[in-house]
């Protein structure tokens, strides 16, 4: 059982208790801190849609520390990021691997960051199937289709040629923040919050 810290906020004569995630949400911060699955995707999408309804023009910050996970669940988050009108900045802390890196690159151009000791990893989608040969062939074709789709989206978001992304994702490809910046996955490596404020003021 995981413990969720509570935050007490005092306003005037009253006090209000928030779980830490609700308090962060109040500041338009969404945290992806686990494997990407259908449940996590639903929660992230719900938070993004809620924050857009509160203010469709104010920035939302998506902090990512994720090993990746389900492609379809990740694409649900990706499509929601693109669907809402509020700009979304992305920040990698710890690691953004696989679908985590894909979502890191999906932030608004100019607002994609990584902390200095974070790790980014990109690769092609993988899957294991058992059953009849015909069914295995069907699933293999779907994986190849998803591979091409993900690579084309990543090429678009990084500004790199499609063939470069295909080569970069052929195997597990671990990147430092500086290497991720060179590839176009992020725009800047942040050491402190002041770096982010300076970036936005420029």
Curated annotation (Swiss-Prot):
GO terms for molecular function: ATP-dependent peptidase activity; ATPase binding; serine-type endopeptidase activity. Fourteen ClpP subunits assemble into 2 heptameric rings which stack back to back to give a disk-like structure with a central cavity, resembling the structure of eukaryotic proteasomes. It is found in: Cytoplasm. PANTHER family: ATP-DEPENDENT CLP PROTEASE PROTEOLYTIC SUBUNIT, ATP-DEPENDENT CLP PROTEASE PROTEOLYTIC SUBUNIT, MITOCHONDRIAL. The active site is at 98 (nucleophile), 123. One of its GO terms (biological process) is protein quality control for misfolded or incompletely synthesized proteins. Gene3D superfamilies: 2-enoyl-CoA Hydratase, Chain A, domain 1. It comes from Desulfovibrio desulfuricans (strain ATCC 27774 / DSM 6949 / MB). Belongs to the peptidase S14 family. This is ATP-dependent Clp protease proteolytic subunit. The gene is clpP. Transmembrane segments: none annotated. Its EC number is 3.4.21.92. It catalyses: Hydrolysis of proteins to small peptides in the presence of ATP and magnesium. alpha-casein is the usual test substrate. In the absence of ATP, only oligopeptides shorter than five residues are hydrolyzed (such as succinyl-Leu-Tyr-|-NHMec, and Leu-Tyr-Leu-|-Tyr-Trp, in which cleavage of the -Tyr-|-Leu- and -Tyr-|-Trp bonds also occurs). Cleaves peptides in various proteins in a process that requires ATP hydrolysis. Has a chymotrypsin-like activity. Plays a major role in the degradation of misfolded proteins. Keywords: Cytoplasm, Hydrolase, Protease, Serine protease. One of its GO terms (cellular component) is cytoplasm. It comes from the Bacteria. SUPFAM superfamilies: ClpP/crotonase (SSF52096).
């Amino acid at each position: 059982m995981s413990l969720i810290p509570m935050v007490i906020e005092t306003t005037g004569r009253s006090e209000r208790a928030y779980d830490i995630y609700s308090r962060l949400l109040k500041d338009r911060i969404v945290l992806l801190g686990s494997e990407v699955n259908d449940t996590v995707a639903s929660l992230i999408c719900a938070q993004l849609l809620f924050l857009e309804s509160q203010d469709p023009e104010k920035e939302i910050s998506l902090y990512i520390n994720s090993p990746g996970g389900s492609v379809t669940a990740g694409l649900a988050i990706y499509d929601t990021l693109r669907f809402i009108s509020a700009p979304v900045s992305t920040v990698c802390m710890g690691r953004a691997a696989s679908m985590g890196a894909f979502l890191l690159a999906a932030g608004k151009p100019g607002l994609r960051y990584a902390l200095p000791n974070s790790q980014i990893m990109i690769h092609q989608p993988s899957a294991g199937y058992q059953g009849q040969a015909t069914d295995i062939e069907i699933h293999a074709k779907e994986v190849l289709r998803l591979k091409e789709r993900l690579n084309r989206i990543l090429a678009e978001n990084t500004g790199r040629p499609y063939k470069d992304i295909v080569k970069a994702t052929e195997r597990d490809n671990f990147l430092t923040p500086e290497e991720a910046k060179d590839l176009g996955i992020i725009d800047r490596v942040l050491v402190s919050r002041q770096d982010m404020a300076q970036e936005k003021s420029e």
